[in-house]
């Protein structure tokens, strides 16, 4: 079963685990573990996607409980009326707070996007980022005798494919566990020494700016273990929990 963070008559929010597909495509038609089908079976009604999370990303995923609700949610995402906040563990010490305005060329899949236009120019892509903490661990990686990691808060202002992963790679602070845009040597070291065997990117919060509602997704065991090893426990208090209760018997946390 998936953790339901919030549900009302219009929408449902779940905490998507890393490694789960949001929905099947013709490329993944034999996939057994899919968020949409699991939520449908769990709550007993159809759900409609409003946005996406990459397969390796964990965290808050919103779905409409009708096609109209899904359409309106998607529209709010497009118009930036719903804000998203992520947390990531990155290579090196990213300590400043800034806005990166760096256009991105659309990434096309050779199979899924084989009919898409390939002559598109770079599309606007803007990300606000803020360094929260740093750590230096006594583990040699490559030619360096120690390994440095940073905990970063991210707010995408646009929604390009793999935007956060590509923007952090552009800053030379790739997300740990990113097999496509990251540092393979760092990924192997993180997995071997600290159990970081997945993309360390988590969609922590989705506030609805028109309503006094913010939905927070708790961190999984891999994240909690990393925060403990790096001395970062207490820095993400709204997300650092494994089990908790909420009004109406919902497994979630709603802050307003």
Question: What is the meaning of each model-derived region?
Answer:
Residues 1-256:
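RNA pseudouridine synthases
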């Amino acid at each position: 079963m998936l953790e339901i963070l919030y549900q009302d008559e219009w929408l449902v929010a779940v905490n998507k685990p890393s490694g789960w597909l949001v929905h099947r495509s013709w490329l993944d038609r034999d996939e057994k573990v899919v968020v949409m089908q699991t939520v449908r079976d769990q709550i007993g009604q159809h759900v409609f996607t409003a946005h996406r999370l990459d397969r390796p990303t964990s965290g808050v995923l919103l779905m409409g409980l009708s096609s109209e609700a899904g359409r309106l949610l998607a529209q709010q995402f497009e118009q930036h009326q719903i804000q998203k906040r992520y947390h990531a563990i990155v290579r090196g010490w990213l300590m400043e707070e800034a806005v990166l305005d760096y256009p991105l060329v659309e990434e096309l899949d050779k199979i899924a996007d084989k009919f898409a236009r390939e002559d598109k120019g770079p599309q606007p892509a803007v990300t606000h980022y803020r360094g929260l903490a740093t750590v230096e661990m006594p583990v040699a990686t490559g030619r360096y005798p120690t390994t440095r990691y940073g905990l970063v808060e991210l707010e995408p202002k646009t929604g390009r494919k793999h935007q956060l992963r590509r923007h952090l790679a552009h800053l030379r602070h790739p997300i740990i566990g990113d097999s496509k845009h990251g540092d393979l040597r760092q990924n192997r070291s993180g997995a071997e020494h600290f159990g970081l065997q997945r993309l360390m990117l988590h969609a922590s919060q989705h506030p609805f700016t028109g309503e006094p509602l913010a939905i927070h997704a708790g961190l999984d065991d891999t994240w909690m273990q990393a925060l403990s090893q790096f001395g970062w426990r207490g820095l993400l208090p709204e997300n650092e929990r494994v089990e908790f209760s909420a009004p109406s018997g919902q497994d979630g946390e709603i802050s307003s």
